[in-house]
Curated annotation (Swiss-Prot):
Tissues and organs where the protein is expressed, per its UniProt entry: Secreted by parotid and submandibular glands.
Protein name as annotated: Statherin
Gene transcribed to yield this protein: STATH
GO MF terms, alphabetically ordered: extracellular matrix constituent, lubricant activity; hydroxyapatite binding; structural constituent of tooth enamel
Modified residues (Phosphoserine): 21-22
Alphabetic keyword roster: Biomineralization, Isopeptide bond, Phosphoprotein, Secreted, Signal, Sulfation
GO cellular component: extracellular region
Chief location bin: secreted
Length: 62
């Protein structure tokens, strides 16, 4: 019984992998694979951590 469950899961995995790769081949053949994506645009660098709030101090002249 355990062997049948293992064989069923293995067959299901193989069929899903095959279905995914055939879809990619189909989309590549009709020229729509990656459609809608523009050229590479670098992501602007952001600080690793949010900066603490820095209040603007008013400078008084004495």
């Amino acid at each position: 019984m355990k062997f049948l469950v293992f064989a069923f899961i293995l067959a299901l995995m193989v069929s899903m992998i095959g279905a995914d790769s055939s879809e990619e081949k189909f989309l590549r053949r009709i020229g729509r694979f990656g459609y809608g994506y523009g050229p590479y645009q670098p992501v602007p660098e952001q600080p690793l951590y949010p900066q603490p709030y820095q209040p603007q101090y008013q400078q008084y002249t004495f």
